[in-house]
Amino acid sequence: MSNITITETAQTHFANLLGQQPEGTNIRIFVVNPGTQNAECGVSYCPPEAVEATDTEIPYAGFSAYVDELSLPFLEDAEIDFVTDKMGSQLTLKAPNAKMRKVSDDAPLVERVEYVIQTQVNPQLAGHGGHVNLVEITEAGVAIVAFGGGCNGCSMVDVTLKEGIEKELLNQFVGELTAVRDATEHDRGDHSYY
């Protein structure tokens, strides 16, 4: 069974929308370009004739959500919510594993560190047009990373590395990582955030 959460407010929203569709229409949750930096999640109507034998059905009160077998592992721990604030209402879909498949706790250190970078660190850097890639982990337990995009040449990169990335990684990999170092040649340019 899949670990996809649809909040009660989102379930009510979907039930209302589906009430205006032909009988038997449900929803489909999917990932386009799963496992890549260009991964995008979506929700669409799913008429009965669009259901495939390999789809996973997640039943809810009044409707079902269908997920194709390729998207399923990338939607692990996904949450769909319908939030209302002063600005209006919107559907939110958080899928922390859309760009990279979740790795097991006993996976090699390099895979676990790469997973944390792609799912926790890079989404924060993306707001500034930046990203970081894991280059290697040395025998001494030092994670060597390279910054790219808006982070390359940014004057705040040292703070981001020490106060953000290193603190996060050392916290999550106690006893396995000893430090995080930057391998990037920082040339300031128009692309730099600060």
From Swiss-Prot:
Binding-site list for [4Fe-4S] cluster: 151, 154
Keywords of this entry: 4Fe-4S, Iron, Iron-sulfur, Metal-binding
Cofactor binding note of this UniProt entry: Binds 1 [4Fe-4S] cluster per subunit. The cluster is presumably bound at the interface of two monomers.
Gene Ontology terms, MF aspect: 4 iron, 4 sulfur cluster binding; iron ion binding
Quaternary structure annotation from Swiss-Prot or TrEMBL: Homodimer.
NCBIfam families in UniProt: PRK11190.1, YhgI_GntY
PANTHER family found in the cross-reference section: FE_S BIOGENESIS PROTEIN NFUA (PTHR11178:SF51), IRON-SULFUR CLUSTER SCAFFOLD PROTEIN NFU-RELATED (PTHR11178)
The protein's name: Fe/S biogenesis protein NfuA
